[in-house]
Amino acid sequence: MSESVTTGSDDDGGDRESSPVMLSQSFDPMSSSSNSSSEENSDDDYEKTISSKKRHPRPNSKGVNVKRSRRNAIVEEDPQEEIFNNLFAFLLDQKVDTMDIAVSWFADYAKDNQSALANLINFILKCCGCNRAINVFDVQDQDSASATLSQIQLSVERTSTRDYPLNSKNLKFRNFRKRLTGLLSNFVSQLSIRNYLYNSTVFEDIMSWVVAMSSSTMRPIRHTATVFCLNIMTFLCEKSKELLNEHAIATKQLEKEEKRSRVNRNRINELNNSLGEIVKQQDTLTTYLNDYFDSVFVHRYRDVEPKIRVDCLQELGVWINTVPSIFFSGSYLRYLGWMLSDINTTVRLTVVKVLRKFFETDSFIGGLRHFSSRFKERILEMSCVDADIGVRVASIRLCNAMRTCGFLENSEILKVLKLILDINPRVQREAVLFLCKVVDESVNEKIDLWGEEDYILKAFSQTSLTTFSVHWIKFSQMCKLLEEVRLSYQSSFDYDTLLRIFQKNGNFITPITQALLNACEIDSIYQSWEDISNFVLFDNYTSTLKDPIDSILSFCKLNDFQESILLQLLSASIQTVCNNNFITPKTVHNKQAAETTNDQNKDKDLLYLNLLPYINSITERNSASPTLLHDSLRLLFSMDLTEMTDPQLSRHFELLINNLKKFFLTNNDLQIIQGCTILFLRLDSIPALKEDLKLLVTDICDQTVTEFLKNFGSFNIQDAVITKDEFVIFEACLTRIEGCTSLKDFSDYPEFDIIYERLVSLLSRVPNSYEDTLKFSAINTLQSLLFWFFLRKDNPADEEKKKDDETKVFNCLINIMNNDSSKILQLQAARTFLETVIMKEGVKASHYNDDNRVSEEHNFLKPQFLDALLKILEGWLYTYAKVGQFPFKRLTQASSPHTQISLDKNPLNRRLLEHVCCDLTSKLLIVVSLSNTITPEFSQQFCELRGHYGPKLSAIVDEFLN
Amino acid sequence: MTGLNETDARILVTSRHLFLWPLAETYFKNAEKVLQDCGVCDSFGRLLSTGLQCLYSVLMDTKMEPRVELLTRKRICEVLLSHTVEYADVEAILNRALIIAEQHNLTEYKFSLQLLLSRVFCRTSPKAAKVLLTRCVREAEEYAKVAEIYHSNNQSNPHRWVYEFLLATLEFQNVSQVANSIHNYANHHKHQHLQLLAMILNQSLPMDEISTDSDQISILCLVTQIAQCLRKGEILLAREILPKIHSKLESETFVWPSSYIDFFIDDTSKISIKWMSINQLYLLIYLISGFCYISDSTSGRASRFLQEGLRITGDFKHQERCVLEYLESQKWINNITKDMKYYLIATYLSRSRLSKAERILQSTEDDQTGFLGILKGMYLQKRGDLKKAEVHYRETAKNFSFRTDTFIISTLNLINILEDSAAASRCLESIEPLCNKHEKKIFKLWLLVLKVIREGPQVHQSNVLPRVIQQSSEYANTQLQYISLTELSERFGKLEHAEKMAISALELAKKSKDELWCLISGRILEDFYRSVQKYDKMRQQALENSAYSKLIEDIYSFV
């Protein structure tokens, strides 16, 4: 076999304990992966190393002086002149068929084999972007191939270019690779047809040059030659596969012939000879494949050029699929396993895609268990923390294929399922797809255990459980799995408090809900909101002493947490159905669009008419459980209430409103009260309900004010000790007053001053983390009161009073921002301060045009205020950096250390903290812009944030800077 | 190769398997003999290794036919799986063989290889085994459909592989599920033998006599029927079946060719299932026989069966032909020996053979079933050491609460000796739901009796006790009979029935050598005679009671 050009420290293909290029274990998942083009590696070090070890060419024993003089002539040739090669020209000519090119070469070879061979080698050199040529004398001695190539390489190095056909963007090379592949396919085919592959040395002669080139220190030559060799091996594999089929056919024919009662000896001998020939050819191909694998692949799969590595691994995947009898074994799979840790993204992605095909091939399952046990940890790691999103997504798909084969344990499946809460939407969606597959598989197992779907339906049809659906099993399994995923992340008080702040407007979608929305898009069964509703309302779990009914009902019975997830599934289902069914096609003609709109309106009314009674029933059923009731109310958040105009809905709305009133006034759970408030605000947009709702809100507010005065009227807020029981009462009362101030203008109330004073006093209490929730409500209530203030067009006599009130509130907020020990309360105070300023500026724009007043309002953003805000923002960025594992970037010069709140490093917390930081940053930048206090130092501070905390925050900063 | 032409020489070279295969099998057979004679030893390993080397030598031939390679690899895997735990090697060899089968469309061979692969996966990756077998069942069903259409006569019954794969799923599926699958498939294709197999696996055989030409299947069916009866506590019915087994075993025409039982799909195709050797069968029959009569404390039949079974365990000869089966058989014999000891102890205790029971107890090691704890408690209770007995019962109930049978038995015994009525009532309440739901009705009967006893003779329970007495006869539980009769006679007072019941109870207790209950029932009889002024009978009974009292005092003096 031919020798390599160089004799470096290449591995001989033995078993390896470690991968050739180790991937760093401390990847930053938030940073974007660098492009392959930016990873163009310099060949200088490699070439220097190779050059220092280069052998001197062996002296030619023949001593032909003419050859030496001709080699010298090659070097002396004018390098600028373009050397013509007919094969290369034909290849670039799109009109010439590649088969014709191959056939013409063989015709030339039949006439003059040496010239044809030299022409072919020159063709290969042209494909390498090498403007050099050899002559017939060089191909006469195959042993001199390495020496000849060395000389060519030396002459080309001085004029080398990085642009060569395989990676060129020149238009004339746009189909180069595709046509080259076709040409090589036809070439190998012709070699086989003409028996040159088995009975001639021409193939070996050609390959000796190709193998020598594949070890060149020049990248264009090395890459192109490697591609030649890999493609040729691919086509040899295809030929080997054909021979295997022929072998099988001949074997069967021989068996049949031998079993005949009247044996045909001639036919048997003929078949035996045919079999012998096939076996011989198979052996020849197998020898070729093994030799070229050892000569080329073993070295090039570790090449410094990522493209070469990618090509090697892609072709290895093809070989394994084509000829598994040769390549599907641990000896070859391990190369793929090692390259899972390659530093290049494209290489890793290629390996993952190749492996997924293997795991999706049923016949390969027997040979993949050992590979799985060895490399699945790495694959799971790639799914969870790889730097490139594309690789992560592909790895999750690979994990799904591995799971389908049974190679993932339950704990490993859970690791992937956790990714449904990942911060990246693509990863989320792929993980949800994985989740749906897991659920389907589990459900099918359960149904098989209980006796198939038809049997189950028949059993239930004989009972009084008429609302039962087999899909309940699926919904139940989904809820149980999501519970397991959710509980794997430890929830903390700080997380819950932050979540409450940002759920205030009802538009915040929880990660679980987002996952379920994705599931609804993936599997239409989850859009069956009627089935889900019936499942939610079902409560007849008493034993019927009938199997499998009891087993199924026992399985479908959910605990509170699981029911909460089920309600979120129902919410996602409703959202998906509404979004999917009521989107007007853009291409529809106007008239048709009008008709479609009318039909959709009718469908929508019908949907709401069917849906609202279910929701009323669900809320009534779950009224005893605060958590479930909150999730039930959130079902209404999924619906566009302004679209509900059907008169038949009024009865259901009346019931809903009465229920909401009852929940608001009697329930002490903060989330319930907030939910009712949001729904009242939304229901107010329905014209038919305005009058009734107005009366109801007035009644609610009156009762709430009475309650507030009863609790706080004579209570020494600033100094008194609040007991546990009092705390619960106060918390609920303040939450209700917060809701009422959102619903109605309180400035007309005679008790307004007392309420205002009490709330300000509450904010002035000594900081106590136990009472933070009381201050949250107080802050929000004061904000609402100020909002109503700003909206009123008062006479000038009230301006002074308004200013005094504003000053009191702002002073309290500043005091909290500077002095309170609760960082979450500081955050809330900062957000309220910023929102109030933004709100005031917005109201002012519609009320005042006096420039003097504008200048007066800027006094609110005093330097000490700005410093306090920046300090708070920096603290949250510090926490976000810790949780998200980013490098922390300071905003201020303050030397005091930052303390991190108690949030674990998991995707849930990272998502929430991202939201917090983006919200706070955007509001701060808006206020600074409005106040016209931007300084170069300030801009510089925020400019440095770009790229450090993820794309969302960077986008906000970019918008500000622009 | 002097004198051989090129063609003959080539044939000889490429046909080396014709020589090496038989040679390898010779080594394997000799290894099996060594295994049966000496167990796992060095010579066995050497013989096995040499045989494998012969097969590996066949694989060295690069010109062998694909079928030869496939069969050689298959045989290597079978040997490795039977005698070693070299699963990685088996996987690699099987992988190549599967590829060959796939390439050459050798479907039957592919199925057999997949079956071997599933055995590997069952040990290395159970989930993968489940996936593999699920796919294989589906493939085999499709293959069977196609084969039926084309009526291929050159191959074995195509349905065979469906059954093979279904049976292989027993490794990770419960028996009833697998049995149902087999039953459905066999019922659809009218494979009667396989329907029978499904019923055996599901333990749902009808109690009628099963007509079959195979002695092995006949014995298997009878044993299954007995197991069904014992599971429900129907001892009398089990005793009726037992003579049929004995008769079959003693028959001159009885044949037990091997440990494998064949279930025929058609006249030629069959499924062979490993059950047990003839030696194992005799041990099992002795155990079953002893168990059937263990509740009959009036005779020593149970102890005789169990003693004989224990005796022949010492002479047990292994007939297994592979290491894994040998190890499994050894484990089986250890377990059955332990079971026989336990039941023998129980038999001795029920007949007050305390010295014999003590001797076996001292030589018995602790187990993981909790049954030994109950036996120790029973022994101490018989000796009159109620406090220590209570400790054993409580510990057993606490430590083995997850085993329903053990928990119920230990708690019932505990209730029987508790002096604290409140504690006894709490125990009764704790096990009442379990007894009511349990398949063995005997537990419920015992519960009822204990409740009646605890309520005292003042409460006239005219319905419960007669029902218990009747059902205890059906379940052939002698102890339950005489205890119930004693309690019922006490409640009848001066009625004539009281005498009859007391006499019956006394007779049963005498036969069971239960001195304590002899004394109790004797005193009831004595009181009855006094109440009806039959003073001669009263004095005679008083003398007997005095003797029993003396015996009991002697027993308690050792405490």
UniProtKB/Swiss-Prot annotation, chain A:
One of its GO terms (cellular component) is condensed chromosome, centromeric region. Gene3D superfamilies: Leucine-rich Repeat Variant (1.25.10.10). Residues 21-30 have a biased composition (Polar residues). Residues 236-275 form a coiled coil. One of its GO terms (biological process) is chromatin looping. It is found in: Nucleus; Chromosome, Centromere. Signal peptide: none annotated. This is Cohesin subunit psc3. It comes from Schizosaccharomyces pombe (strain 972 / ATCC 24843) (Fission yeast). The gene is psc3.
UniProtKB/Swiss-Prot annotation, chain B:
Disulfide bonds: none annotated. One of its GO terms (biological process) is chromosome segregation. Keywords: Cell cycle, Cell division, Chromosome partition, Mitosis, Nucleus. Its main location: nucleus. One of its GO terms (molecular function) is double-stranded DNA binding. GO terms for cellular component: chromatin; cytosol; nucleus; Scc2-Scc4 cohesin loading complex; SMC loading complex. Involved in sister chromatid cohesion. Forms a complex with mis4, which is required for the association of the cohesin complex with chromosomes. Interacts with mis4 and rad21. Belongs to the SCC4/mau-2 family. PANTHER family: MAU2 CHROMATID COHESION FACTOR HOMOLOG (PTHR21394). This is MAU2 chromatid cohesion factor homolog. The lineage of its organism: Eukaryota, Fungi, Dikarya, Ascomycota, Taphrinomycotina.
